[in-house]
């Protein structure tokens, strides 16, 4: 399988199975999971980045435990719509995952402003300190990304 358009993901990923959302950071990978009906995304956890094969094994283990059938990866598009080096890095991550699991459907979702929005929410509504936010922002951003993709799929 290859990277697919988000709108094609429901036809490829088996029905009534969750999807996983990823926020790829420099040091961590934020992970979120949807419910089986693909209506609600919830933060699941963090994978502390080491080497790619270990990161992928940890991700696949999380996916198997939730019976997830596809991945939505946040794509950090620049504000002007262009793709920079972080987009290239996220696309390379997806290609590398597909080398290990060829049957895995992967789609991208524009994650512009997701981390900023989550930080504002955690400061404004949850009144979290910077240290505490660091522990949750990536998995919350992954949930934000996945929820945006789920909302888009629901409104097709």
Swiss-Prot record:
SUPFAM superfamilies listed in its UniProt record: Ribonuclease H-like (SSF53098)
GO BP term, pick one? rRNA 5'-end processing
Q: Enzyme group, top EC level?
A: hydrolase
Single GO MF annotation: nuclease activity
Q: Which domain of life is it from?
A: Bacteria
Q: Which GO terms describe its cellular component?
A: cytosol
Supply the Pfam families for this chain.
Answer: RuvX
The EC number(s) given in the record are 3.1.-.-
Matching CDD domains, A to Z? YqgF (cd16964)
List localization entries. Answer: Cytoplasm
What keyword terms does UniProt attach to this protein? Cytoplasm, Hydrolase, Nuclease, Ribosome biogenesis
Report the function annotation for this chain: Could be a nuclease involved in processing of the 5'-end of pre-16S rRNA.
> What is the similarity comment for this entry?
Belongs to the YqgF nuclease family.
Spell out the protein name for this chain: Putative pre-16S rRNA nuclease
- Organism of this sequence: Phenylobacterium zucineum (strain HLK1)
